[in-house]
């Protein structure tokens, strides 16, 4: 017996089939979208995490270079304590030979060199003039630069251990946003007589 299907039934069946196919297609697309979005998000997080790790490793390496530079220079500073004016050449060489260090100084305790006045802090720093880098020199300390009250001096002096300062704007010294690595210098009795510093710029 020959079956008979009306045109309407065929149309209706086609609609059902197409609707089912469309639903399946939409479900597949939604699953694919969710998977893709999740994958893209995970990839972005992994990339950001990797970038952060690389940056942290690079910064850590640079900070270690700054620390090592000062520690390796302590002996020559101690050797020249009897001639304070010669410290200028030492500080200038530190800044000139290390591109990470924009300024370096030695902040002596008040009246360490009585002939130099109450405060004495020789300080060398670099400035850019066009494409040329110039090393300048200052003697800091006084009412306009009361360094014994500054964190980079006071904290390592009290703790008798090296210290990285929080970022700050240095007026009178570097005149820029910087962080300072401070290394206490002690005499044979273990008393701090100066704070040896290296500044890194956070705005270059």
Language-model region placement:
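Extreme N-terminal signal-anchor transmembrane helix of membrane signaling/transducer proteins, especially
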Residues: 3-38, 42, 46
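Short, conserved clusters of charged catalytic residues that mark active-site
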Residues: 10, 14, 54, 86-90, ...
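Generic alpha-helical secondary structure signal
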Residues: 22, 43, 47, 61, ...
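Extracellular/periplasmic ligand-binding regions of membrane signal-transduction receptors
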Residues: 49, 53, 60-97, 101, ...
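Short beta-turn/strand-loop junction motif enriched in small, turn-promoting residues
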Residues: 57, 168-170, 185
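Extracellular/periplasmic ligand-sensing ectodomains of membrane signal-transduction proteins
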Residues: 96-162, 167-176
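Conserved beta-strands of PAS-like sensory domains
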Residues: 174-204
